[in-house]
Swiss-Prot record:
NCBIfam families: PRK09925.1. This is leu operon leader peptide. It holds the Pfam family Leu_leader. Involved in control of the biosynthesis of leucine. The keyword Amino-acid biosynthesis applies. The gene is leuL. InterPro entries: Leu_leader (IPR012570). The keyword Lipid metabolism does not apply. Keywords: Amino-acid biosynthesis, Branched-chain amino acid biosynthesis, Leader peptide, Leucine biosynthesis. One of its GO terms (biological process) is L-leucine biosynthetic process.
Length: 28
């Protein structure tokens, strides 16, 4: 189960980073 949680965590981090880049790109 731990590997599943870590995998989901990585997906969430990637999604948040992509959103942050998109938002920052739009703002700039």
């Amino acid at each position: 189960m731990t590997h599943i949680v870590r995998f989901i965590g990585l997906l969430l981090l990637n999604a948040s980073s992509l959103r942050g880049r998109r938002v920052s790109g739009i703002q700039h």
